[in-house]
């Protein structure tokens, strides 16, 4: 999947609107993932799974940092996310389907917070971007 110039512009615009809330929003998306897909909790046995948990907020910030890195390097995601892909494939052994679950909840969370700025075009571009990000993160499983 290739992102068009319009997709890249839309993703950058949406992520800039997220701004300083990126960690909180990604923490919320992770929390939604845990609620919607309980088996995803198995990767975090030490977490407190309540809303506002410090562990979920901390992991949310890590996710936000990874998304920010991906947004900044959309033209070479494979290189930018290589270490993260290695970590998830070889060390953490995260089931690849979990990336799709999280990406779905990222879209839900961003839609709920961006309101009218979450246009159909932004939605489509973010969906493509997150699918590409998931593909890169699971590329080392093969």
From Swiss-Prot:
Q: Which residues carry this modification: Phosphoserine?
A: 4, 36, 50, 125, 139
Q: Which domain of life is it from?
A: Eukaryota
> Has the keyword Heme been applied to this entry?
yes
State where heme b binds.
Answer: 88
> What InterPro entries has UniProt attached to this entry?
Globin, Globin-like_sf, Globin/Proto, Hemoglobin_a-typ, Hemoglobin_oxygen_transport
Residues with N6-acetyllysine modification: 17
Question: Which residues, if any, are the signal sequence?
Answer: none
Is this entry keyworded Iron?
yes
Q: Which residues carry this modification: Phosphotyrosine?
A: 25
Q: Which CDD domains match?
A: Hb-alpha-like
Keywords recorded for this protein, A-Z: Acetylation, Heme, Iron, Metal-binding, Oxygen transport, Phosphoprotein, Transport
Task: Kindly list any coiled-coil regions of this protein.
Answer: none
Instruction: Identify residues that carry N6-succinyllysine.
Output: 8, 12, 17, 41
State one molecular function term (GO).
metal ion binding
List residues of the Globin domain: 2-142
Tissue range of expression?
A: Red blood cells.
Which residues of the sequence carry a binding annotation for O2? 59
List every position bearing Phosphothreonine: 9, 109, 135, 138
- Tell me a GO biological process for this protein: hydrogen peroxide catabolic process
GO CC terms of this entry: haptoglobin-hemoglobin complex; hemoglobin complex
Function, as annotated: Involved in oxygen transport from the lung to the various peripheral tissues.
Oligomer status and interactors: Heterotetramer of two alpha chains and two beta chains.
Assigned protein family: Belongs to the globin family.
Record protein name field: Hemoglobin subunit alpha
Gene symbol here is HBA
